[in-house]
Every structure is written in structure tokens, then in C-alpha cells.
From Swiss-Prot:
Protein species of origin: Neurospora crassa (strain ATCC 24698 / 74-OR23-1A / CBS 708.71 / DSM 1257 / FGSC 987)
Biological classification of the source: Eukaryota, Fungi, Dikarya, Ascomycota, Pezizomycotina
Summary of subunit composition and partner proteins: Component of the 7-subunit TFIIH core complex composed of XPB/rad25, XPD/dnr-10, tcf-30/SSL1, tcf-29/TFB1, tcf-11/TFB2, tcf-14/TFB4 and rtf-1/TFB5, which is active in NER. The core complex associates with the 3-subunit CTD-kinase module TFIIK composed of div-66/cyclin H, prk-3/KIN28 and rtf-2/TFB3 to form the 10-subunit holoenzyme (holo-TFIIH) active in transcription.
InterPro entries hit by this protein: BSD_dom, BSD_dom_sf, PH-like_dom_sf, Tfb1/GTF2H1, TFIIH_BTF_p62_N
Protein name as catalogued: General transcription and DNA repair factor IIH subunit tcf-29
Compositional bias per record (Basic and acidic residues), positions renumbered to this chain: 453-465
Protein family per UniProt: Belongs to the TFB1 family.
UniProt entry keywords in alphabetical sequence: Nucleus, Repeat, Transcription, Transcription regulation
Top-level lineage group: Eukaryota
Length: 663
């Protein structure tokens, strides 16, 4: 059976970047600093993890908090917050690691006979393990069915409070019932009785929280329209990503022809072409528009690089119908196929729709157990399947697996046999034993109160850190008179001036994002909150193209790093795919350069227009109008794509190292 790929992610711990993953045997969660190739700094045994907490999807920060059981009796449990820092896949990486940890912890608790089972819990709750499992599963992506059982739902207080926040009428009923309950009835018993009659509401709400919108046929939802003889097309970057995922052929055509064609021209021609009708599953007629760019791809394959979770899993040979057909040599129905199996005129349309349906369904999470994750017993039956088929109520109680303790030296357990202390340690112990804590604190407080009146002038805190506030030195206020560069101290003039300049630069940058300036004759007007219409003073169409270009570039970067991290560097298939993706990254940078050139061209046109307005105003009034700088242009585009360009250069540099054999 093919092993499950162990997830890993970029996560910071205590403001230090690193890599978090599980050991190959899935027994420990490890974190090691970047680049993640050294020994792990943090190693947490999965069996010692008592709780998993994750920030909700509405929070931009993705933090996974892992709680470990106390290492000593009476000690507090240790918590390890890991913040995932990947630019686009932080939430997916955190969900993957949390889902796998939740699955392993649930299996460990299900197989441990010393832990209470949810079915045997008391009437007031499902036990600590059930509450932990449910609390860790409320925000997970895929929940096992058993976490929707009655005991689990009644024990999950967080889910109940969330439901009452949504349903005000239910919250009002709960509060009134709680106020009118008898004093002899405990809060736990009241909660159990109250929610026992509303299990269906809890189950429906839990399922609603864990549902998400699936993929859909995006091409059928985009309809170009004509207004006043001009073609109108509304498409956003999310739709572009879906088109690239469902139709790799379109992504290949896009990568080969943009920036030769502009973004708007490419998509306008595509949605009017015959290829678009074919991919949507519509019949092509002789009256349809012909486009030499897209018509040559009508017979091209549209199934390249389609990821599939279902087809990637290994199927048991006993039910592998496709494999049996392969071995048996196909159909045995004579020379002529059945009438229903003969090709018809609409067969290409059916194949197109079936292919698209397979692509959409291929990445839908299955409701049953992943076959590749199941372990098999000696007779070939999956262990998980055999557990489901076994009649648990006919089995006897499992024998508790106790751990035998072997104690060799008991002398250290008694105070009379403690090892002897050194002379210095014994003297310190006697000194500390004779002191009274209240007297010591009083003496320290008295020394602090008399600092300014003891004749020594007190303590100059500025001088202790090397700062002279009376100095006229604007550079470094250090008391060190030696030549050479001096470090900036907290509170010095140089440090305050640096902080002031940094704040002013941030305000200036933020103001440039939120304001745009227009000139009417000799006057100019500053309009605030114009970032939605003209972000960074860029024209609306340029800003829209920049958004689409950024989204497609991020998609190419994501695919490059996914292929780079998930395969062997020496495999020929990976070398070929990495070469194709690296070429796509180079083309992406060319698209950004073309966009910057066009933005600069538009900026020059606006500047020429304003110069003409100023000259006309001078000719009419005889007064000179104030020149207002024009924003946008090449610098604005490069500033917006600064982080993206850095990622492109880093990825291309890594590919060059792979190509030269240094990685």
C-alpha cells in the first residue's frame, strides 16, 4: 500500500521561523529552525498531546496551539503555539497537520483500554477525552462520523455556545430555563438534560460549520455581453484560478501567449472562440467565430497535470474492475459493438462533460476511509474494516496493559538518606534558613527609598545605558568619547529621530494608497478613500490587470514549490515539470514588466494632458497654476509587485541550482 504523505508547513515559534511536521513513524510532532534540515528543537510525543486549538478561519493569523500533558505531577500543562507563515497555504498546512494529529490521537484513545470510552461515560458528559476530541474537531476540515454522536455533541460546550449566539430564541429559552431550575439540579445535569432533546439542532449546526463550497463548472457561469457595440466581460482572479485548475490546456495557452497579448484581449478572444464552446460542452457550428490562436488547440489534450485524490489511491484487486478489464483484454462481444456503445454525433460533448465532472469530483474528499491509509492483517482484510464488522458487544472486557515499574535504588526516596551537600551549599542553606523573608524585603525597600538621600546622588539611569540627554550630539548620544561608529541607545536623540522618520514614512506610504489627486484647470483636488477606484493612483483597468497578474503569478509559484517539495530532485519527470514551471515564472516576470511599461505610458499621457490644461489656464488668466505630481506609473507597479518579484527571483535561483546539480 502507498504510504500517506506526511504534511509539513512553515511555522514560527517564539518569533523564530522553522518547519513543523511529524516523524516518519507518526509518533512525534517536531519543529526545527529553517532550513529544517537539522535536528528538531521541539519534539512532542503524540501520545502526550492532550488538546489541539486552532484560530478560526475568519482570523488572518493561523496559529495551532498544541497542549502537552504535565511532565510532573502537579505541574501545569505545557502549551506550544505555532504560527504558520506561508503566504498562501498557511491555512491548508495547519489544517492538514491538525487533521492528521486528531486522527492519530483519536485512534490512540480508541485503542487504550485504560481511558474511558464515550459510550460508557456518565450522564453529565462524555468524559475528558471526548470533550478534547470534539473541541479539537469543531474547526477541522473533515470530521469522522463518530464525532457527531450524541455524547460528543452534548459534551461540546463551545459548539452549544456558538449555536446560541446564532439562535437568539434558543439562547433566551436556555437562560430562562436555567434561572428557573431547582437548586438541587447541578449545571452539568441541567446542560445534559437541556441538550438531550436538541441533539438534532447540534448535529445540523456542526455539519453546517464543517461544510464548504465545492468546485463548479466556472466556464458556464461567465457570459460575455455586448453593450453599445462594445464587449463587456467580468472575470476575477478566483475564476481565473478555477479555469486553470479545471482546464490545463487554457493555462498552457495563457502561458504561451501572454504578455504577447494583453490580459483583457486574451480573455475576450478566448470566450468568443470555438475552444471556449467546446470546453463548456456546447455544440460547435459553422457560424461560430474563428480564431487562429485558439482553433489550433481544438484537438489538443485537456487532461494534462490533473490531480486526483481518488485515482491516486490503490484499489484492492478484488474490486478493481478497470484492472480486470486490462488483464482480460477488453470487451468480448464480437466484432460489432452494441448499438448503445457506438459513437454518435454528440459523443465529443458527452466526453467533455464527463471529463469536467471527473476533474471536479476527483478532489472531493471521500466519505469513507482512505484505502491507502488502512493497514492490513494477515488474511488481507483491512484492520479498520475488520473493526467495523466486528461485534463489539460480544467481546469481553479488554485486559488493561499496565506498565511494570522496576526501581533499583530507593535510597533517594527518604530524607535520611539524601546525598551529602558540599560545605558551601551547606553554609548557604544555613544562611537562608536563618533569614526572615519579610525582613529582607523591608531592607531592600529601605535601600530603594534612600537612594536619592544617601549622599551618592542616586542612580542615573540614562548614564547607566550610555545616554546623555544634555548632549548636543545629533548623531549618537553615547558617553563613549572614542572615535568610530557608536551604537544607538534607547531614548537617545538619534533613536528618537530614527523612530520619527520611520513613522512619517509609514504615514506617507499609507496616504499614497488611500488618496488620489486630480487637477481641474488651475486647482487641484485631493480625494480620499479612492483606493478601490484607483489604488496607488493606477488607472482602473491597469489595477484590475495587476490583480489578475498577481493571482496567476502566485498560482505558478505555488505549483513550482509544490512540485519542488514533494518529489525527488533526480527524477526525470520532476526535472521536466520544474523546467516548464521555471519557464512559466520567467514569463510571469515579463508580464509584470509589460504591465509596468503600459502603466508608465498611461502616466505620461496624463502628465501631457495636465501640462496642456496648465498652459490653457495660463493663457486665459495669466496666472501660473501649481504643478501637482502624477502618481502611478512604472514605480507604482513595481512597488506593488515587490514581494511577488522577490518570490519569482528566489524560485528561479533555486531552479538554476537544481539544474546545475547543487541541490
Amino acid at each position: 500500500m502507498a504510504p500517506i504523505e506526511i504534511p509539513r508547513g512553515q511555522a514560527s515559534y517564539k518569533k523564530r521561523e522553522g518547519i513543523i511536521t511529524l516523524t516518519p513513524d507518526k509518533t512525534a510532532l517536531i519543529w526545527s529552525p529553517l532550513p529544517g534540515t537539522g535536528p528538531p528543537v521541539i519534539s512532542l510525543s503524540v501520545s502526550n498531546i492532550t488538546n489541539l486549538q486552532q484560530t478560526p478561519k475568519t482570523n488572518p493569523k493561523v496559529v495551532l496551539r498544541v497542549v502537552e500533558k504535565p511532565k510532573a505531577p502537579g505541574a501545569d500543562p505545557a502549551a506550544y503555539p505555532f504560527q504558520f507563515t506561508h503566504a498562501t497555504e498557511a491555512r491548508n498546512e495547519a489544517d492538514a497537520i491538525k487533521d492528521l494529529l486528531s486522527q492519530i490521537i483519536a485512534e490512540l484513545r480508541g485503542d487504550d483500554p485504560s481511558l474511558p470510552k464515550p459510550a460508557k461515560s456518565g450522564p453529565n458528559g462524555a468524559g475528558a477525552s471526548a470533550a478534547m476530541a470534539m473541541a479539537s474537531a469543531v474547526n477541522s476540515k473533515h470530521l469522522p462520523f463518530r464525532w457527531f454522536e450524541d455524547d460528543m455533541l452534548k459534551a461540546d460546550v463551545e459548539l452549544q455556545q456558538s449555536l446560541m449566539k446564532k439562535d437568539k430564541a434558543l439562547a433566551h429559552i436556555y437562560n430562562d430555563a436555567k434561572l428557573s431550575k431547582p437548586d438541587s439540579l447541578s449545571d452539568a445535569s441541567f446542560n445534559s438534560q437541556f441538550w438531550a432533546t436538541r441533539i438534532s439542532l447540534l448535529r445540523a449546526y456542526a455539519i453546517e460549520l464543517n461544510q464548504k463550497k465545492g468546485s463548479y463548472n466556472v466556464l458556464s457561469t461567465i457570459k460575455p455581453r455586448t453593450e453599445n457595440g462594445e464587449l463587456k466581460l467580468n472575470i476575477n482572479h478566483e475564476q481565473v484560478q478555477l479555469i486553470f485548475q479545471q482546464h490545463p490546456l487554457v493555462k498552457r495557452i495563457y502561458n504561451e501567449n501572454v504578455p504577447k497579448l494583453t490580459e483583457s484581449e486574451f480573455w475576450s478572444r478566448f470566450f468568443l472562440s470555438r475552444l471556449s464552446k467546446k470546453l463548456r460542452g456546447e455544440r460547435i457550428t459553422d457560424n461560430d467565430n474563428t480564431d487562429p490562436l485558439f482553433d489550433k488547440y481544438l484537438e489538443a489534450d485537456n487532461t494534462m497535470a490533473v490531480p486526483a485524490k481518488i485515482t491516486a489511491t490503490s484499489v484492492p484487486p478484488i474490486i478493481n474492475i478497470e484492472g480486470n478489464e486490462e488483464n482480460q483484454g477488453g470487451f468480448r462481444g464480437g466484432n460489432l459493438k452494441d448499438v448503445e456503445m457506438r459513437p454518435r454525433a454528440n459523443i465529443p460533448i458527452i466526453k467533455t462533460l464527463n471529463s469536467l465532472s471527473e476533474k471536479i469530483m476527483a478532489n472531493v474528499a471521500p466519505t469513507d476511509v482512505d484505502p491507502s491509509a488502512a493497514s492490513y492483517s494477515k488474511d488481507g482484510i483491512a484492520d479498520a474494516l475488520s473493526k467495523q464488522l466486528a461485534l463489539q458487544d460480544l467481546r469481553g472486557d479488554a485486559e488493561a496493559q499496565l506498565i511494570r515499574l522496576s526501581v533499583k535504588d530507593t535510597s533517594t526516596f527518604f530524607t535520611g538518606n539524601q546525598p551529602s551537600l558540599t560545605d558551601q551549599e551547606a553554609a548557604d542553606a544555613r544562611l537562608y534558613a536563618t533569614q526572615v523573608p519579610s525582613d529582607v524585603l523591608f531592607e531592600v525597600q529601605a535601600d530603594m527609598d534612600t537612594l536619592d538621600s544617601d549622599g551618592r546622588g542616586g542612580i542615573d539611569l540614562h548614564r547607566s545605558i550610555g545616554v546623555d540627554p544634555d548632549s548636543d550630539d545629533e548623531g549618537n548620544n553615547s558617553l563613549d568619547s572614542k572615535s568610530g561608529p557608536k551604537p544607538q541607545h534607547v531614548g537617545s536623540r538619534a533613536a528618537l529621530r530614527f523612530a520619527q522618520n520611520q513613522i512619517l514614512e509609514s504615514m506617507k506610504s499609507a496616504r499614497s494608497h488611500l488618496t488620489t489627486t486630480t487637477t481641474h484647470g488651475g486647482s487641484h483636488t485631493t480625494t480620499t478613500n479612492a483606493s478601490e477606484e484607483r489604488p496607488m493612483s493606477l488607472p482602473t483597468d491597469i489595477a484590475h490587470r495587476a490583480t489578475l497578474t498577481c493571482a496567476t503569478t502566485a498560482e505558478f509559484l505555488k505549483q513550482f514549490w509544490t512540485v519542488f517539495n514533494n518529489s525527488s530532485n533526480s527524477s526525470p519527470e520532476k526535472q521536466q515539470e520544474l523546467a516548464y514551471l521555471a519557464d512559466s515564472l520567467v514569463r510571469s516576470k515579463q508580464r509584470i514588466e509589460a504591465l509596468a511599461d503600459e502603466a508608465e505610458k498611461r502616466r505620461q499621457e496624463i502628465m501631457e494632458k495636465r501640462k496642456r490644461e496648465i498652459r490653457e489656464y495660463y493663457q486665459k488668466t495669466g496666472r501660473k497654476a501649481k504643478w501637482v505630481p502624477v502618481g502611478g506609473g512604472r514605480d507604482a507597479v513595481w512597488a506593488a509587485f515587490e514581494g511577488v518579484v522577490g518570490g519569482l527571483e528566489r524560485a528561479v535561483a533555486v531552479w538554476e541550482m537544481v539544474k546545475s546539480g547543487r541541490i
